[in-house]
């Protein structure tokens, strides 16, 4: 389901999550994942059953009302994963954030509440992290563009962009300003802001943890909200650039395709 940003009362309060939403978020947790600073795993939470869900629901409702997230939820462990090249060069690694299990549940609930609004805001040219828009669909679409342009001798240009540290480079203040201009409900925006306020991380190398590092920009890898917030940030860039998106395909944070007259860097 999507919600048209031009319809409805976007100042209306979003009601707190139900116990059913909490239970569904618990069920969606993936097993065999490393724990965060709370040392709690998905298997342990699921074993807690209805009693755990009831207590967590009470906490989430309190957070929903006060818009204040417990400090522990804003802390994470970052594990560097080697991607390629020289192992001594930091840029050849990507970081995966290990988050507290209770925050993962809260984040998943907030993701489900935000998704219909985001789907009604971002354009059809964005395909990353969107249900029903597979890689195969985009490959098929670009092949059709190539074949038709070749058939009718239309000049076509392809632009491949690799965003370096895409998640880490997002300016949070600008992101939330964009969310406000795009009429994201105030409650959901406030909770998303709370989830990104005063975030800290500790780098884990083998069994050693660094001192806490305050992070002021970016969204966290491994956070359910990260993909939605990244798509909103990219939507703001597209709108601010004044790009005519007709006939354009955007797919993943690495690739974009434009016709010649639509290229703007």
Region annotations inferred by a language model:
Residues 1-91, 97, 101, 105:
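Surface-exposed loop/turn segments and immediately adjacent short secondary-structure elements
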Residues 32-40, 78, 88-98, 137-180, ...:
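Conserved catalytic palm subdomain of right-hand nucleotidyl-transferase polymerases, strongest
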Residues 40-48, 126-133, 160-166, 263:
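Conserved short loop/turn motifs at secondary-structure junctions
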Residues 64-66, 143-147, 246, 251-253:
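Eukaryotic intrinsically disordered and solvent-exposed regulatory patches
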Residues 163-261:
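Conserved polymerase palm-domain catalytic core
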Residues 1, 32-35, 54, 66-72, ...:
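Short helix-interrupting loop/turn segments at helix-coil junctions
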Residues 133-139, 228:
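Amphipathic alpha-helical oligomerization segments
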């Amino acid at each position: 389901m999507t919600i048209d940003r031009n319809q409805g009362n976007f100042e209306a309060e979003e009601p707190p999550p139900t116990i059913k939403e909490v239970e569904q978020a618990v069920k969606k947790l993936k097993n065999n994942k490393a724990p965060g600073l709370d040392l709690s795993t998905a298997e342990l939470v699921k074993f807690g059953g209805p009693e755990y869900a009831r207590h967590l629901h009470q906490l989430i409702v309190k957070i929903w009302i006060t818009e204040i997230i417990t400090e522990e939820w804003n802390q994470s462990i970052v594990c560097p994963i080697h991607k390629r090249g020289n192992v001594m060069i930091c840029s050849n690694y990507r970081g995966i954030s290990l988050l507290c299990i209770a925050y993962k549940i809260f984040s998943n609930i907030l993701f489900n509440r935000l998704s219909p609004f985001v789907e009604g805001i971002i354009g059809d040219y964005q395909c990353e992290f969107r249900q029903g828009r597979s890689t195969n669909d985009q490959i098929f679409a670009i092949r059709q563009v190539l074949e038709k342009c070749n058939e009718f001798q239309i000049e076509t240009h392809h632009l491949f962009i690799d965003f370096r540290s895409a998640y880490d480079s997002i300016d949070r203040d600008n992101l939330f300003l964009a969310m406000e201009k795009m009429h994201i409900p105030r409650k959901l925006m406030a909770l998303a802001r709370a989830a990104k306020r005063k975030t800290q991380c500790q780098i884990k190398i083998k069994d050693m943890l660094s001192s806490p590092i305050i992070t002021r920009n970016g969204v966290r890898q491994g956070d359910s909200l990260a993909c939605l917030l990244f798509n909103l940030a990219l939507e703001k860039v597209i709108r601010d650039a004044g790009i005519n998106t007709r006939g354009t395909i955007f797919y993943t944070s690495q690739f974009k395709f434009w016709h010649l007259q639509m290229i703007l860097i």
